[in-house]
Each structure stands twice: as structure tokens, then as C-alpha cells.
Amino acid sequence: MQVNENPNKVPVELNRTSLYLGLLSVFVLGILFSSYFFN
């Protein structure tokens, strides 16, 4: 069961990483837009 659980955890981590990357990119885009508005 443990051997089957390991491969299952890998895609979940990848999905989490992609989600975090998406949030980070949105945050960066927001900062860029705010800087444009301030300028």
C-alpha cells in the first residue's frame, strides 16, 4: 500500500506547486499593474 501511496503523492505535490506558481505569477502581475498605476 505504501508503494502505491508514493506515486499518488507525487502528482499532488506537482499540482500544489503549479497552483502556488500560478498564485505567485498573479501576485507579480498585480504588483506590475499597481506600479504602472502609481507611475
Curated annotation (Swiss-Prot):
Chain segments annotated as transmembrane: 18-38
Alphabetized UniProt keyword annotations: Membrane, Photosynthesis, Photosystem II, Reaction center, Thylakoid, Transmembrane, Transmembrane helix
Listed InterPro entries: PSII_PsbL, PSII_PsbL_sf
Biological process terms in GO annotation: photosynthesis
Subcellular location(s) per record: Cellular thylakoid membrane
Membrane topology: Single-pass membrane protein
Any GO CC annotation of this UniProt entry: photosystem II reaction center
Record-stated family: Belongs to the PsbL family.
Quaternary data: PSII is composed of 1 copy each of membrane proteins PsbA, PsbB, PsbC, PsbD, PsbE, PsbF, PsbH, PsbI, PsbJ, PsbK, PsbL, PsbM, PsbT, PsbX, PsbY, Psb30/Ycf12, peripheral proteins PsbO, CyanoQ (PsbQ), PsbU, PsbV and a large number of cofactors. It forms dimeric complexes.
Function: One of the components of the core complex of photosystem II (PSII). PSII is a light-driven water:plastoquinone oxidoreductase that uses light energy to abstract electrons from H(2)O, generating O(2) and a proton gradient subsequently used for ATP formation. It consists of a core antenna complex that captures photons, and an electron transfer chain that converts photonic excitation into a charge separation. This subunit is found at the monomer-monomer interface and is required for correct PSII assembly and/or dimerization.
Official protein name in the record: Photosystem II reaction center protein L
Lineage: Bacteria, Bacillati, Cyanobacteriota, Cyanophyceae, Synechococcales
